[in-house]
Design a protein with these regions (language model features):
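Phosphate/nucleotide-binding beta-alpha loop and adjacent structural elements of enzyme active sites
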Residues: 1-157
Length: 157
């Protein structure tokens, strides 16, 4: 279910008193944490098998998306590793702060130049949220998919 279509969840996210329920829902219930967690293609399994079990490493996850679902560092975090998670979506960072408080979680965009950028949301939690409107047009033309652009939402500089 998309969060934006749920009247109950839209109510819950408006009131700070309920924000922890909203985060819990997005981390554990919505994404079936008990069935599907960790990276999409098992990248972290290779990294963990490369080091011995006692090794507690560090990581940087740029474009971290979600604390458990399709996340390349979730199993490393559960194994005692600690790191920095960076994403341009404020909701993503709030979810990381809730689920992974021992990490450093930063709401920022990474760029090779300093300029104001507009953030375009495809959906509240989506891997295609972007700073580039052209990227959404490319996806629409190449994949023949319709995207609703909710942005501009935030200005980054």
């Amino acid at each position: 279910m998309k969060t934006s279509k749920s009247k109950f969840l839209n109510f819950v996210k408006k009131y700070p008193l309920f924000k922890n329920f909203y985060y819990f829902y997005n981390i554990y219930i919505r994404n079936y944490k008990f069935l599907n967690n960790g990276s999409q293609f098992g990248e972290e399994k290779f990294i963990l098998s490369f080091f011995n079990k006692a090794h507690k490493g560090k990581f940087v996850d740029i474009g971290c998306f979600h604390p458990t679902r399709h996340n390349n560092t979730y199993k490393m975090y559960k194994s005692g590793w600690r790191g920095i998670n960076i994403d341009l979506n404020p909701l993503t960072i709030n979810l990381f702060n809730f689920a992974r408080p021992k990490d450093i979680n930063i709401n920022a965009a990474i760029s090779d130049n300093e300029e104001n950028k507009t953030l375009y949301f495809v959906d509240e939690l989506n891997t295609q949220n972007t700073l580039e409107a052209n990227h959404l047009l490319f996806l629409k033309n190449q994949l023949n998919q319709e995207y609703i652009i909710h942005g501009p939402q935030h200005q980054y500089s």
